Amino acid sequence: MHDIKAIRENPKAYDRHWSGKGRSGAADEAVRLDAELRAAQTTLQEAQAKRNESSKLIGMAKAKKDEAEAARLMAEVESLKGVMATAAEAENLADGQLKDLLASLPNIPAPEVPAGEDEHGNLEQRRWGDATKLPAGKLNKPKDHVDLGAALGGMDFEAAARMSGARFVVLKKEIARLERAIGQFMLDLQTVEHGYTEVSPPLLVKDHALYGTGQLPKFADDLFATTSFDLGRYDDEFARQAAAIGSALDKLSDEHRNQLKYLLSKEYIHASVQNALERSHWLIPTAEVSLTNIVREQLVAEEELPMRLTALTPSFRAEAGSAGRDTRGMIRQHQFYKVELVSITTPDQSEAEHQRMVECAETVLKKLELPFRTMLLCTGDMGFGAKKTYDLEVWLPSQDMYREISSCSNCGDFQARRMDARYRKTGEKGGHFVHTLNGSGLAVGRTLVAVLENYQDEGGRIHIPAALQPYMGGVTHIGGQA
């Protein structure tokens, strides 16, 4: 969400950023709606003040037995009621349109973010690790994780497809244990060494939680909802069914006919569906949603910041915009585990906290001795709510390229405004918007893929990184032949 006052003061600056996201003219539209809203509010307030004044004068006129004046004033009050109703309607309309517009507009990038249209505009910041020193680095044609998983008998995409469809997997045996070990290792690292507080949050959230972090309303198609109902499609079906049973209704008694008509009425069905939707939830696409919303509508003391939270949870994504991409294997799944990092801090500390978060994510890859590079994303490749984002990309030998494994973003006060999350400075009464940051520390499934591929040897064994061996009961390798 954006500060309309800031947009009003410098619309060209905002429009310059939004035009690159296909929203040219959005700033001018926001200013126009804001002007309509304020004009309606002024009209309403003036009419209310005039009505109150006239109401007092009516009493005075009646006390003086001046019936003509009292009648004139009463007519004036009645007229003002119409003005107030019109102004209130205009206020509600402009307010709703302005809120909808602001909710649909992405965050403004930080000045140091490079301009660009897509991933080709991202800037590499650094690289770490040497893939040739790992077991897979000695192979001419390293296998991908799908073939490795099949050889180990621990990765079954067909069984998952039979029960859930595409983009799911059943992990078994040593691979399932390795996945669990990776998640526990990451969580211990972030809590014990990096000082994050472990949280076990809800996996189901309401609309307002996803609105707060920016997934709704724009990205509903990428989410899984527990309840779905299309009222428009229902209306068409209702009309067809009502026509078909119309003649049958005439044969019922008046009492039964009226009861049945009500139960079949659009008003009743709409009310019932709305009630169901209000009770519905969404599966979280990332624990960022649950962790960040902990401070929703809260006023936090400055002494409590930075607040660093982490959670190991499943994440659920519909991947609506990913048709045809990464259809093989575990790179892009509807359900996957991830260790999420969230920081709540002050504006003056958010940049330093961002750099720290990136280092916390990088440490996971360093301890696993997985080669990676860190990228600063350009304006066209950043997410909706981010003002600055770093991606970590891990080396996958089967693809001979780096692939994203973590994304760490500073959202500034963008999410805080949507959630009304504030902090209070020492000695002050008022509140200031917090800054929120989030990142993966890391995606467990993609880390599993990277370990399998980078630590395979010519005999088909998977060597277990030293950092994971304590979580695997001391096992040093799985599968294959010595």
UniProtKB/Swiss-Prot annotation:
Transmembrane segments: none annotated. Pathway: Aminoacyl-tRNA biosynthesis; selenocysteinyl-tRNA(Sec) biosynthesis; L-seryl-tRNA(Sec) from L-serine and tRNA(Sec): step 1/1. GO terms for biological process: selenocysteine biosynthetic process; seryl-tRNA aminoacylation. It is found in: Cytoplasm. Keywords: Aminoacyl-tRNA synthetase, ATP-binding, Cytoplasm, Ligase, Nucleotide-binding, Protein biosynthesis. CDD domains: SerRS_core. It holds the Pfam family tRNA-synt_2b. One of its GO terms (molecular function) is ATP binding. It comes from the Bacteria. Its EC number is 6.1.1.11. Residues 1-26 are annotated as: Disordered. ATP binds at R317, A318, E319, E404, I405, S406, S407. HAMAP family: Ser_tRNA_synth_type1. Catalyzes the attachment of serine to tRNA(Ser). Is also able to aminoacylate tRNA(Sec) with serine, to form the misacylated tRNA L-seryl-tRNA(Sec), which will be further converted into selenocysteinyl-tRNA(Sec). Consists of two distinct domains, a catalytic core and a N-terminal extension that is involved in tRNA binding. Homodimer. The tRNA molecule binds across the dimer. PANTHER family: SERINE--TRNA LIGASE, SERYL-TRNA SYNTHETASE. Belongs to the class-II aminoacyl-tRNA synthetase family. Type-1 seryl-tRNA synthetase subfamily. This is Serine--tRNA ligase. It comes from Caulobacter vibrioides (strain NA1000 / CB15N).
